[in-house]
Amino acid sequence: TLEFLLLLIKSEAFRFTDKSKRSLFWEAHYLLGHKEKIESTLSLFKSSKKSLKLPELISSEIEDAYDQLELFGFSLGHPFRLFTEWQGQESVSIKDWSKYLNNHIQVIGYVVTIKNNITKHRQQMQFGTFQEFSGDLFDTVHFPMTSNKNIIRRNGIYILKGIVKSDLGCFNLEVISAYSCARLPDPRYN
């Protein structure tokens, strides 16, 4: 059906055709989007089907990423490409955290998951797993004093400042502050 074909086009299943998604949408609607007219037997002239000639329709990588986000709940490409404000910021690589044990650092990460907890004193705290730009994962602890000011609410890129700690040989970041980077505007609706 047309609906399923449009979903396949939107998910970039037809990349191999080297046609843009917009061109494929038009072709799909042209071929499947209307009902065939029943030819009357009394027509004087037989009309031929018109061929479809479209201008170059271009879509951007950001549009594709937002389509994927809408369809799957995540982008198939690098998650950092949908955000701004993190470029040019200092970020200590996870591979170097051993040099910064019990010291303050800044790291930039994409939220993989957040677990919200309530302490025995009825205060909120969070545990998080983030992905660094290189793809490496790191864990964070957000104690109540900082969690109340810097709640991680949704997936996105965060600039995290905190203290590197080691627990049973695994490094984690005890977060002091978390700044949420802005998402690029969706060009499909501009």
Question: How would you label these PLM feature ranges?
Answer:
Residues 1-99, 174-188:
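Sliding clamp-binding short linear motifs
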Residues 18, 76-189:
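Single-stranded nucleic-acid-binding OB-fold domains
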